[in-house]
């Protein structure tokens, strides 16, 4: 248990994944990172992920309809729970394999990858992550957050930022009071 807490402290992933196995080394991703998938819906997620990382100052990211040249390979694995995912960066090929039980699972895996990139990268021009394998699935089906705009006004941009934050923390339900 203590070792697991130490690993969590090093990776700093929120919420804490079910299982994290680190190798102790890091992976420096190439200057041009390609996120690829054979699935059109996963490519739409990849495009959204790239735009979020670019907003955070990362560059050299693109998406591709093929897994062959991809640095980050997205796929669906029906053996996983619907919102579960595995993220594996332990290969000597310096690639990241991300499989989800559904599109939702892949999205949660991308949120974890973003947290790893932001935490481990000192310079956004040189992306780096720890070499690790994560197996995760939510413990609760309903994970919600509430925003009450009826009693306190928020701008559209503030609401969008709030939604991005709760999504990054794998919250799947947004309860919004407008009146």
Where are these regions (language model features)?
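Contiguous, structured surface segment used for ligand recognition
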Residues: 7-142
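Substrate-binding cleft of carbohydrate-active enzyme catalytic domains
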Residues: 138-179
């Amino acid at each position: 248990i203590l070792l697991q807490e130490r690993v969590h402290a090093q990776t700093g992933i929120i919420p804490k994944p079910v299982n994290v196995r680190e190798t102790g080394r890091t992976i420096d991703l190439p200057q041009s990172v390609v996120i690829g998938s054979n699935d059109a819906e996963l490519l739409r997620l990849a495009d959204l992920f790239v735009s979020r990382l670019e907003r955070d100052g990362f560059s050299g990211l693109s998406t591709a309809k093929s897994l062959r040249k991809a640095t980050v390979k997205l796929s669906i694995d029906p053996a996983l729970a619907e919102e579960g995912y595995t993220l594996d960066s332990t290969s000597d090929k310096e690639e990241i394999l991300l499989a989800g039980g559904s599109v939702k699972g892949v999205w949660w895996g991308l949120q974890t990858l973003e947290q790893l990139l932001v935490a481990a990268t000192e310079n956004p021009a040189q992306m780096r992550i720890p070499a690790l394998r994560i197996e995760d699935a939510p413990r609760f089906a309903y994970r919600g957050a509430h925003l009450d705009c009826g009693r306190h006004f928020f701008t559209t941009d503030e609401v969008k930022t709030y939604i991005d934050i709760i999504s990054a923390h794998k919250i799947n339900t947004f309860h919004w009071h407008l009146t």
